[in-house]
Regions:
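A short alpha->loop->secondary-structure connector
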Residues: 142-144
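Histidine-centered divalent-metal-coordination microenvironment in nucleic-acid enzymes
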Residues: 119-138
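Polysaccharide-binding surfaces and accessory modules of carbohydrate-active proteins
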Residues: 150-205
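Terminal catalytic/cofactor-binding subdomain
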Residues: 1-118, 127, 149-162, 198-204, ...
Length: 360
């Protein structure tokens, strides 16, 4: 089994307790400048990578190969790991991003005045920010539709062991067509989420598995700022001319557990290998992926029953087992992290079905 390039992008929430420091976007600007100008732990971008969304001086590469930058959509401080091929390296670089952020706060401010949160939801304003995953993939064009639909379905039921969990829920409020039409005069593509729909608390939800499920609107989308989707197939390639491209998983959440991070990325990598080998079929397709995402997230019975595209129904555990069985049959013994992932994947599904408390 070939080594796959992969990486994470983590958007951090910022809470400012000292009003004299200004707004959160001013604080993240201060910390970004402190990282590159004072500590000199990397090289800041001298030229704009994108006129509207990645202007010059917005961030840069760090000495460990990662990136620290201000995400223009929401003004979050974001850390991207270097691209790696091993799960332990990915987990280590993800934790390095957290330690780097704490170092910046301790050096430029104080933890009493400012705190950064490795979560994916803002309980005050209803905003959401993600932990995105990137994978280098090479899927033949004649099997792309089957592969991506199967991968999306996998990512939906993956929630049972990859969700970050949250108290409460949100409801999206749809904007009027007239409000949306008024945005058409803009020269730059700077349409924000708030221009399209609003969000309000959902008092009917006590707890759910996912922090972001309430905010996802599409299975796949190329315009991700207001069409939040599960995946964003990228046409760009930064590797070589062999046909690899970047699969951008938008629906991801920040896991504090390093084990959860390794498992969610590891299982996804195996499913992508199955897709590249043409081993995925439509028997795993979900009828309504976005609705199933919310259903799994909010199901306090832990049965997690979802509808299949063929008219049947299945539990999320058994749905995951369909992918696991393919991995056991075709990828066991292939080297790398495959055997560890397959073993832990099987154990976690057994525990989720038998007694979830064993996973605590």
């Amino acid at each position: 089994m070939r080594e796959r390039l992969m990486g994470l992008e983590v958007e951090y929430g910022c809470l400012v307790r000292d009003a004299s420091l200004g707004r959160p976007e001013q604080v993240v600007e201060l910390l970004k400048d402190y990282a590159f100008n004072d500590l000199q732990i990397g090289l800041v971008d001298r030229h704009a990578r994108d006129f509207a969304f990645e202007p010059a001086q917005a961030g840069g590469f760090l000495t460990n190969g990662g990136r620290l930058y201000i995400d223009a959509v929401g003004d979050h401080l974001e850390y991207a790991t270097p691209e790696v091929t091993r799960l332990d390296d990915l987990v280590a670089h993800d934790r390095a991003g957290q330690r780097t952020l704490l170092r910046l706060v301790d050096g430029a401010l104080s933890r009493d005045a400012v705190s950064f949160h490795n979560n994916s939801i803002d309980h005050f304003g209803g905003h959401t920010f993600g932990c995105h995953e990137n994978y280098a993939v090479s899927i033949p064009s004649d099997s792309l539709r089957v592969a991506l639909t199967s991968v999306v379905s996998f990512l939906v039921s993956r929630l049972i062991y990859a969700g970050a969990g949250r108290v409460g829920g949100h409801r999206l409020t749809r904007g009027s067509p007239r409000d949306l039409a008024r945005q058409g005069h803009r020269v730059l593509d700077t349409l924000w989420v708030g221009d399209v729909y609003g969000v309000e608390a959902d008092p009917g939800v006590r707890y759910q598995l996912s922090q972001r499920a309430d905010h996802i609107r599409h299975a796949m989308s190329g315009r991700v700022r207001f069409n939040r989707a599960i995946i964003n197939p990228k046409s760009d390639t930064f590797c070589d001319l062999t046909g690899e491209w970047r699969l951008h998983v938008l629906f991801g959440e920040s896991n504090m557990s390093q084990y959860a991070t390794a498992l969610k990325v590891g299982t996804t990598g195996l499913v992508l290998t199955l897709a590249e080998l043409g081993l995925l079929s439509d028997d795993t397709w979900l009828a309504r992926p976005v609705a199933s995402l919310r259903r799994i997230s909010r199901d306090e019975s832990h049965r997690w029953i979802v509808a299949l595209a063929d008219g049947g129904s299945i539990s999320a555990v058994d749905h995951q087992r369909r992918y696991l069985e393919l991995a056991q049959r075709y990828l066991a013994g292939c080297g790398g992290d495959a055997d560890w992932v397959i073993g832990e994947w099987s154990r976690v599904l057994d525990d989720l079905e038998g007694d979830p408390r064993r996973l605590v």
